[in-house]
């Protein structure tokens, strides 16, 4: 092994490559092109090809003259840590005692073979009509970055969020002929996946394509059999995909057999479905910054930045949450890795003029660590963010008992308040808390381990620190009887003592603030915003989705046996497009209300999702305007249900509240019109009420349309808000479900 470049030349190339590699948003093909331009100006190389592998800080350039001479440059990482070189020859650097950033290898036929990397194309599916505004995709982005970091494959990403069509996907696959094709199939994407897979397999049968095909994410892992019936040679990733793709590459190289591939399901030669054991991915050590190839295109559609800083959920007892396809243990990135990945994404976002606001995709951002050190971990991350010159914003999700847990000591809760204050100082903009219900009966059925009053206090503590809130709320569940749970939920959502104005705590200790927010009614009254809780509900009027493999699905089955009723429809077979069961309600009237409210949600979903997505990337003035639309929509939705419940169970207080709301919208005649009445709670009567209530929603959206036309708010480059508004107005009075149950 010898060096054929002068020290001066090596330093020059490392400096130039460092500058190119610092542009971490470039696709590998774009990096290779820039490297080729660099070396074309040089007379020191007569190379056959250039290969770029690695990601962010371990990107490596291989300049291949022929099998007898290969130059390797790694300006940011010591080559002694290079995974490809270590696979080739683990002791290649034994005689070297110093860090190595350049090496010329001679007579290296075996290394030459290692540089013949397999090709992998990963496709992120998306139904744009339902989710018009994109975000940095993590499912394929993280898998890609892992393969690149380990220098296992050349990876190309395709993302349907940015308008890529099925025909374009197929053309790309036929042109590039990848060794492995992977599809990420989320809720509601089964039909789209089948459409693409049908075309892929038709080309395989015709001899136009010879790739290994694998699919992953929620829907295939819930029920692989439905995919195998249609595509017997398909390989399904059951859980995390990093090690599965690693092993598929090894299988491609004949280093592993199919039954040795991590976490894969497949049909063996006898026709039996096999499930290989899945090893847990070392998330803390092995998963780098997601690939940022698509970020430039995402920015054109005013998309948002996302990041996952942990995986899993230690609680894992919510009855509606399936855990089989996820792992129960909570595994966070280290503080250093979290800050590094945040910096990578923010730097790339800045290049594309995406505002420095990151939406954390963690199931539970706070989590639990041995010896209760999770709060200190968050404080350390926040201290790191506070050292940044450029301030950022970030959103994340947490459990209510990560904020306030009455079963814990006062010291524990005060320490949590300190942690949340650090989050506020570091840029926490909005926290999603899975409140889910204001009814203690429902909370028990949901397995939340919290109470309605505990949830109120949690919201109070966080909002007092100036952090905005968003909550999950499951209004309806199939086992609720009568209207009591609904009334409790409506009362909870109308409470105005949960959301606080930001409080200056400069003159207070954390303990003093904690005591006041729990026990001082006068202090609470003075500092509350007066806004009701329904203004922060993420999706109003939502119903329980009974997903496969959940405790709640087993609760329904137990109720069927105990009460001798049939609740799960379709002969007990699930709707595989959404991985859920079509289930009747124990109480038929509640079932009618639930279905109608879901139609209300779906009728507004496209336009409200677009508004919410634009809100994420808007400037402060537009952000305020867009959020006002969201609040008004939530209020209209809340009072729709209140009116429906009032019709079924009238009371004087509700009549007064409804009268005030309707008068504000010049619709007070509804209360006195016997034709606009739920009557016996039939679906027809409920939809009749909703059609009239939709006139209130139309007024809101006409205001949105006017503001858009005046330039008060800004649309995406391809006018997605304009298009969703146009679609909404044309569909007025038509009630249907976006993802209706697939019944066989």
UniProtKB/Swiss-Prot annotation:
Keywords: 4Fe-4S, Cobalamin, Cobalt, Iron, Iron-sulfur, Isomerase, Metal-binding, Plasmid, S-adenosyl-L-methionine
Residues that hold [4Fe-4S] cluster according to the record: 313, 318, 321
Enzyme class: isomerase
Annotated ranges, domain Radical SAM core: 299-545
Positions of S-adenosyl-L-methionine binding: 436, 545
Domain B12-binding: 119-259
InterPro entries reported in the protein's UniProt record: Cobalamin-bd, Elp3/MiaA/NifB-like_rSAM, OxsB-like, rSAM, rSAM_horseshoe, Tetrapyrrole_Bchl_Biosynth_MTs
GO molecular function, one term: metal ion binding
SMART domains: Elp3
Cofactor(s) needed: [4Fe-4S] cluster; cob(II)alamin
Catalytic activity, as annotated: dAMP + S-adenosyl-L-methionine = 4'-phospho-dehydrooxetanocin + 5'-deoxyadenosine + L-methionine + H(+); AH2 + 2 S-adenosyl-L-methionine = 2 5'-deoxyadenosin-5'-yl radical + 2 L-methionine + A + 2 H(+); 2 5'-deoxyadenosin-5'-yl radical + 2 dAMP + A = 2 4'-phospho-dehydrooxetanocin + 2 5'-deoxyadenosine + AH2
SUPFAM superfamilies according to UniProt: Radical SAM enzymes
UniProt remark on domains: Contains four domains: an N-terminal domain of unknown function, a Rossmann fold that houses cobalamin, a partial triose phosphate isomerase barrel AdoMet radical domain and a C-terminal helix bundle.
Family under the similarity heading: Belongs to the radical SAM superfamily.
Protein's name according to its UniProt entry: 4'-phospho-dehydrooxetanocin synthase
Taxonomic path: Bacteria, Bacillati, Bacillota, Bacilli, Bacillales
